Amino acid sequence: MLLELARWLQQLESLFGLFNYLTFRGILAALTALFLSLWMGPAVIRKLAQFKGGQPIRQDGPQTHFSKAGTPTMGGSLILLTVTLSVLLWGDLRNRYVWLVLAVMICFGAIGWYDDWIKIVKRDPNGLKSRWKYLLQSIFGLAAGLFLYYTADVPAAITFYIPMFKSIALPLAGVSFVVIAYFWIVGFSNAVNLTDGLDGLAIMPTVLVACALGVFAYASGNVVFAEYLKIPLIPGAGELIIICSAIAGAGLGFLWFNTYPAMVFMGDIGALSLGAVLGTIAVIVRQEMVLVIMGGVFVIETLSVMIQVASFKLTGKRVFRMAPIHHHFELKGWPEPRVIVRFWIISVVLVLIGLATLKVR
């Protein structure tokens, strides 16, 4: 929105040419989302607190979690609102990728909102039935994959790349591309949701991964950097740095209220939407495998649940004291802040490894 105004004003004053720089607008997007979150946060939390009941607490979970009963949830609505406003202000609204990612965020956020609404207002701790949740996720995930396939304007946009082996490029047919897009979008949507079980545990890795994906998006949209780093050149992908920056800013603003002990929880509205956005951006910039590395905390949390369920069904025994795995460490006696910070440290290391693949040929 403001970019179009700046382009018109540039004819009168060259200073407005700054808005043509992605990095400049990315910084503004992050700061806008951050300050909006800090400003609107208290009012949003007060409004959410009016829904008596708060986040349902697992009865078989750690005893320390019972003190969290009544804490407002659906705080992810603050993230979605501030990200959307920031992107609309600073993004290039003629870019199809911007609209696609916003659509994915809103659609998956709507699923999460309805799930949270059932849990809180209707007092149903199970929320939206799993089959309906996965059906809606599948519809939106497949729709995003189909859109990306049929709007691809360069072969690189539908080619599968393996980090550190940049000479290997696997062209994807329609079905294979859409299937991969579906699994990454829906998979990471649910992975972030599973990780969101402790105060601030999910949002900080999300911020870190979003920042790193912003670097990949910027490089993928730049002819010089893409050629130098031997990564796929995706015209228009650079604009995604605005969304990544907005997520980083909004995420830090939300963490101000979500840090231990949390004043508000993200809820499914935030976790499902942010995970889907990370998956979508990774698919657009053709860095699916790098996302698996950088989002390793989300992957580990998901695998722990899958292993736990499979082991119990096959042998009747549990591998972990409780899944997802962050609860396992809690039940081993780790204080919640220790679990959170150590998972953050792991996330920092994994993101750095992911960024290192930019230079490894």
Curated annotation (Swiss-Prot):
The keyword Cell membrane applies. It is a multi-pass membrane protein. Catalyzes the initial step of the lipid cycle reactions in the biosynthesis of the cell wall peptidoglycan: transfers peptidoglycan precursor phospho-MurNAc-pentapeptide from UDP-MurNAc-pentapeptide onto the lipid carrier undecaprenyl phosphate, yielding undecaprenyl-pyrophosphoryl-MurNAc-pentapeptide, known as lipid I. One of its GO terms (molecular function) is metal ion binding. InterPro entries: Glycosyl_transferase_4 (IPR000715), PNAcMuramoyl-5peptid_Trfase (IPR003524), PNAcMuramoyl-5peptid_Trfase_CS (IPR018480). Keywords: Cell cycle, Cell division, Cell inner membrane, Cell membrane, Cell shape, Cell wall biogenesis/degradation, Magnesium, Membrane, Metal-binding, Peptidoglycan synthesis, Transferase, Transmembrane, Transmembrane helix. PROSITE patterns: MRAY_1, MRAY_2. Signal peptide: none annotated. Its EC number is 2.7.8.13. It catalyses: UDP-N-acetyl-alpha-D-muramoyl-L-alanyl-gamma-D-glutamyl-meso-2,6-diaminopimeloyl-D-alanyl-D-alanine + di-trans,octa-cis-undecaprenyl phosphate = di-trans,octa-cis-undecaprenyl diphospho-N-acetyl-alpha-D-muramoyl-L-alanyl-D-glutamyl-meso-2,6-diaminopimeloyl-D-alanyl-D-alanine + UMP. The chain crosses the membrane at residues 25-45, 73-93, 98-118, 139-159, 168-188, 200-220, 237-257, 264-284, 289-309, 339-359. Belongs to the glycosyltransferase 4 family. MraY subfamily. GO terms for biological process: cell division; cell wall organization; peptidoglycan biosynthetic process; regulation of cell shape. It is found in: Cell inner membrane. Its cofactor is Mg(2+). This is Phospho-N-acetylmuramoyl-pentapeptide-transferase. Pathway: Cell wall biogenesis; peptidoglycan biosynthesis. GO terms for cellular component: plasma membrane. Disulfide bonds: none annotated. It holds the Pfam family Glycos_transf_4.
